[in-house]
Design a protein with these regions (language model features):
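Alpha/beta catalytic barrel-like cores
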Residues: 1-111
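Eukaryote-skewed repeat-based solenoidal scaffolds used as protein-protein interaction platforms
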Residues: 87-154
């Protein structure tokens, strides 16, 4: 069945439970766009590791064999002292979840991550999130990305 709907989810427990309860017909008609925030801050390192581990494993338990768009929110990058570490953060997260159907998603204007997308070892392509603010420049941005060989439209 063709994709008919792309729900934008914050990956909260209620949303995860709803995805598990969808009928196969409905489930096959959607590809979730998941905005992932960092697990809540914890004063204990082991608590933070447990939360991260739970987050990592949730994708394969909730969405086994199902494609989804994976978007890391800005709070993943807030503590980085070097912007060049941003693509590495995304790469590590994608490797940690180890989901064969994950499709990395980036803001259309996120040149740093888009230019580094070939390093993600991902065979599913990427998703470009287009906001209303970048819509009027869509054509020129995509042309620039194509000229730089950052994207290959299909």
């Amino acid at each position: 069945m063709q994709t008919k709907y792309v729900p934008i989810l914050k990956w909260k427990a209620g949303e995860q439970n709803c995805l598990k309860k969808l009928s196969p017909t409905v489930s096959n008609a959607i590809i979730p766009f998941i905005e992932v925030s960092t697990p809540s801050e914890s004063s204990k390192d082991e608590d933070a590791e447990k939360k991260y581990s739970k987050l990592i494993h949730s994708f394969n338990s909730i969405l086994p064999e199902k494609p989804f768009y994976l978007y890391l929110t800005e709070n993943w990058y807030n503590d980085l002292d070097d912007a060049n570490k941003i693509p590495e953060t995304y790469k590590i997260f994608l490797e940690d979840i180890d989901h064969p159907q994950a499709i990395p998603a980036f803001e259309l204007t996120d040149e740093l991550n888009i230019s580094n997308a070939p390093n993600l070892r991902n065979e599913n392509g990427i998703c470009l999130r287009i906001s209303i603010n970048s819509f009027e420049h869509l054509g020129e941005i995509l042309e620039q990305y194509r000229n730089n060989s950052w994207i290959t439209p299909e």
